[in-house]
């Protein structure tokens, strides 16, 4: 269906989503959204791309917005350990390109705080025969009988935090 998967993009971005508490303290957490959120999309993409080994990484991190605890929003991520004296010295945005031993490349972005429209999580895989996007629904892009095709697959939500646990609860 996909042929040789040679490129992938994955994002796990929050507009205002630092949970506070130990999550923002680098000595206790080890880092920000890359370690908290990004590892999951890296793991999933590596699995979907065939489990190849990384051979090089280029990355950049930013701490420009902080945890923005003073800003009110509809969605708020709060750790039970959050207090009025939280430290925030981790990145609020991380971006990287990972090259694998088969030549494929994965581009990732993970944020606790980013000036975007809304929180988003997307995974896209691009192969020599077709591509797929989980956003949160699953859409296949390819060709059929000489025509470019987009096929939206009728599945339960593929990449939704709430959707991930709905089946476990029901």
Where do the language-model regions lie?
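Predominantly a Rossmann-like dinucleotide-binding segment in NAD(P)-dependent oxidoreductases
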Residues: 1-86
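Short, well-ordered coil/turn segments that N-cap beta-strands
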Residues: 2-6, 92, 102-106
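Beta-strand scaffold of nucleotide-dependent catalytic cores
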Residues: 5-8, 57, 107-110, 134-135
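Adenylate-forming
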Residues: 18-20, 119-122
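Glycine/small-residue-rich pyrophosphate-binding loop that anchors the diphosphate of NDP-sugar donors
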Residues: 33, 37, 94-96, 104
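Secondary-structure transition into beta-strands, especially the periplasmic turns and strand N-termini
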Residues: 51-53, 99-104
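C-terminal glycine/acidic-rich active-site capping loop/insertion
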Residues: 58, 62-90, 95, 99-102, ...
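Glycine-rich phosphate/pyrophosphate-binding beta-alpha loops
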Residues: 109-117
């Amino acid at each position: 269906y996909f042929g040789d998967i040679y490129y992938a993009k994955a994002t796990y971005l929050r507009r205002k989503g630092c949970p506070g508490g130990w999550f923002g303290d680098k000595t206790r957490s080890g880092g920000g959204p890359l370690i908290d959120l990004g590892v999951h999309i890296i793991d999933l993409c590596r699995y979907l791309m065939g489990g190849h080994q990384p051979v090089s990484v280029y990355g950049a991190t930013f701490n420009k917005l902080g945890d923005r605890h003073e800003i009110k929003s509809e969605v708020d991520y709060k750790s039970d350990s959050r207090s009025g004296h939280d430290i925030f010295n981790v990145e609020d945005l991380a971006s990287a390109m990972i090259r694998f031993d088969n030549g494929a490349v994965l581009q990732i972005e993970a944020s606790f705080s980013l000036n975007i429209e809304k929180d988003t999580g997307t995974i896209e895989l691009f192969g020599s025969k077709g591509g797929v996007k989980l956003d949160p629904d699953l859409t296949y892009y390819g060709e059929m009988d000489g025509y470019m095709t987009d096929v939206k697959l009728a599945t339960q939500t593929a990449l939704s935090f709430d959707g991930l646990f709905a089946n476990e609860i029901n």
